[in-house]
Amino acid sequence: MKTYIGTKIIQAEPAFRIDGEIYPESGPVPRSMNREEGYRVHYPDGYESWSPKDVFEQAYLPLTVNPDLRTDAPSISQQMVDDFILETWTQTMGDKTTVVRALLRNGFEIVESSACVSAENYDEKLGREICLGKIKDKVWFLLGFLLQTAVH
């Protein structure tokens, strides 16, 4: 059997699954001890499926339309970029270099550095801001690539 990687844009709504039946979160739901939270997933070809909440939220990012753009197509937003970065660590190396490591929500890590010419001018906070700007630019680029792949 071959292994594949895929990317597609889907629509989904929060729902519950009870005894194999899917109920929208917003509608009446029968009481049951076997109530599982998740999402009803709608694919572009009309296929529908169920995804458990934790699996869905790990695999999919919400897309929004940016009102400042001249299109109604979904796009990458600053919020998406910020939310994709789970955690960061900052370290000073030597007496004038800042290194920031960022852990992304998919487990990938990005490392950036900034430095100044003179140790007297070194400011870790400023170095961190510069590094985070570089990291966010890379995340924006990578999410843009992912969205373009899903569109085509």
Regions found by a protein language model. Name each.
Residues 1-152:
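Motif-centric detector for short Cys/His coordination patterns
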